Amino acid sequence: YTDDTICSVAIADAILNKRTYKDSLLDWCRRYPNPMGGYSTALSTWIEQDNPQPSNNCGNDVAMRVSPVGWLFDDYHEILEEAKKSAEVSHNHPNGIMGAQCVATIIYWLRTCRITKEELESAVKRNFGYSIPTIKDIYKIGSEGHFDGLCEETVPYAISCFLESDN
């Protein structure tokens, strides 16, 4: 299991058991301190603190762990708020929060609406301002050796991969 698995379970636990996102994340991450690949540097630092505070971080950790919000809430505005709350306990940069909100919202839309991939792409652009790259642009990551873990880059890449998928 990876850090994202542990953190996703922690978010689900917080929602289902009415815990704070912070308490649940700390509990689960401290209980499982050595996931495959480790925690990001920023999240590791946050976990290790006695009284962790959010950092001005826009890493994709928050987008990777937010899926339970999209599955367990049924109101669009509540999903935006809960995604924000789940992110800002450790990452309070607006770009990180927006990445979490976007991923949770996409899950909600796909779960509750009859929406085509074209409509989804348009809605993401309209609601979150993301420009979705082409698959050719994504292939360049490997050939050019460029990659970063920021929400503003990785969330649109993930959306593009979904839009290009057949299932």
Predicted regions: what is each one?
Residues 1-167:
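Structured, active/binding-site neighborhoods that engage oxygen-rich ligands
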